[in-house]
Amino acid sequence: MFERLEAVEERYEKLNQLLMDPEVINDPKKLRDYSKEQSDLSETVQTYREYKSVRKQLDEAKAMLEEKLDPEMREMVKEEIDELEQKEEELVNKLKILLLPKDPNDEKNVIMEIRAAAGGEEAALFAGDLYRMYTRYAESQGWKTEVIEASPTGLGGYKEIIFTIIGKGAYSKLKYENGAHRVQRVPETESGGRIHTSTATVACLPEMEEIEVEINEKDIRVDTFASSGPGGQSVNTTMSAVRLTHIPTGIVVTCQDEKSQIKNKEKAMKVLRARIYDKYQQEARAEYDQTRKQAVGTGDRSERIRTYNFPQNRVTDHRIGLTIQKLDQVLDGNLDEIIEALILDDQSKKLEQANNEL
């Protein structure tokens, strides 16, 4: 591990020199690439330097114990050693996590798709609750949201809603939301007070750039039509709505949120790129999991990942066994406690796997 850390620090210093090179300064692409690489390495290098400082202090403190000290001073040195050893252990654990392979998509924007599943109108209302939960969470992080396509119902729910979340690191936090979300509550229309169970599915995809996903224009069929509102009524007499069909994969994307056909096509292409990338990633993951004989984890959208129980004001994430009695706060966008627990669990599993492969 420490050989890798030395190599990382050496590369960091090299990048510092390169970023002062006039040739690099005058080359926007190199400047951007080197700056990003330096930024990515910065936390690891600073933590490693802190570790080396603590290690040096620890060696000096232990050397002091070899000298003749009065009892009071010896006790003070022992206390300092205990504190430094605890700090050293914390820094080593942090460095192990920092050296784990990074998800190349973590810094990307997100395309999120929420669909009502089992439960009829109740499922559609729950899909609306989830949409509001994620938009409020995005606001708390300083991110922007933009609707791409929506199929609202008469009571304020959604059969389906697709939207982007724009902000640095959005995917790193929201990628754990993939899967089936279950709600348990008494519908307003239920006179007997019985609890109903409904579900909605969430797909969280990283937004991909054109250069990252090659799509041959010959493989896309473009259909245009007049956009429609709730209930199917026409709201636009121009052919502004766009449907894109990727013939090789059969993936279909529709967008009619904008008045302009050009803007609708741009939005639809963003979703299409993300879905094609996700399809290939899922196929690669499935092959990898089959090889390692592992069960499909959080990427399996048919898996029930979380339950929202209204009568008990309870949220349970079934993947990590986390239960919190703050449903009202969670639906208001306070997702930090759940997301941080999921990130920690993911890091722990990766650390265990890395240790097993040593």
Curated annotation (Swiss-Prot):
Keywords carried by this UniProt record: Cytoplasm, Methylation, Protein biosynthesis
Name the domain of life this protein comes from: Bacteria
Whether Cytoplasm counts among this entry's keywords is yes
Membrane spanning segments where? none
Which Pfam families does the UniProt record give?
Answer: PCRF, RF-1
* Compartments it resides in: Cytoplasm
Q: Which GO terms describe its cellular component?
A: cytoplasm
PANTHER family, alphabetized? LD18447P (PTHR43804:SF7)
Q: What protein name applies here?
A: Peptide chain release factor 1
Query: What is the scientific name of the source organism?
Result: Geobacillus sp. (strain WCH70)
